[in-house]
Amino acid sequence: MQQNKLSLSVQYADTRVQDILTRPLLRKWVKAALLAPAQITLRFVDAAEGQILNRNYRGKDYATNVLTFTYNDDDGSDIADDAVTQADIILCTDVLQREAAEQNKTLIFHAAHLVIHGVLHAQGYDHESDEEAEEMEALEIEFLAALGFPNPYIEA
């Protein structure tokens, strides 16, 4: 598989996970899901910041696990296919930890899944329709398997 160039910034607004979800680990996960060169910021936030962002940008007044913000050309159109993917991916540590516990998964496994999920969103993948969801889930399963993780959609 081709290694795509990555410029990665990691921000720990919520520092509780910085010793577990380290920059080298995050870089490995992001690169596993890259289909093109990218400039990506991963930001770990608490529930309060996650809720504010979800409310302000999606109109949903609760913290969610991952939000992906992509950048468009000045005219509002999508970035050209051959351009560098640019995105901010926000991960809410409170939701990550809660979901991992509820799903009997390690924080590492669940975080890897959601980082890959966010990177796929940054590259234009979505799950609004069943067909889109199946395509996105298949890629998530493939990329996670390449990293040594099991299928995240099979209940433990």
Swiss-Prot record:
PROSITE patterns: UPF0054
Positions of transmembrane segments: none
Annotated Zn(2+) binding sites: H117, H121, H127
Primary site of residence: cytoplasm
One Pfam short name: YbeY
Cofactor list: Zn(2+)
Keywords, in A-Z order: Cytoplasm, Endonuclease, Hydrolase, Metal-binding, Nuclease, Ribosome biogenesis, rRNA processing, Zinc
Subcellular location: Cytoplasm
Stated family: Belongs to the endoribonuclease YbeY family.
UniProt-listed HAMAP family: Endoribonucl_YbeY
Protein name per UniProt: Endoribonuclease YbeY
Species whose genome carries this gene: Herminiimonas arsenicoxydans
Encoding gene per record: ybeY
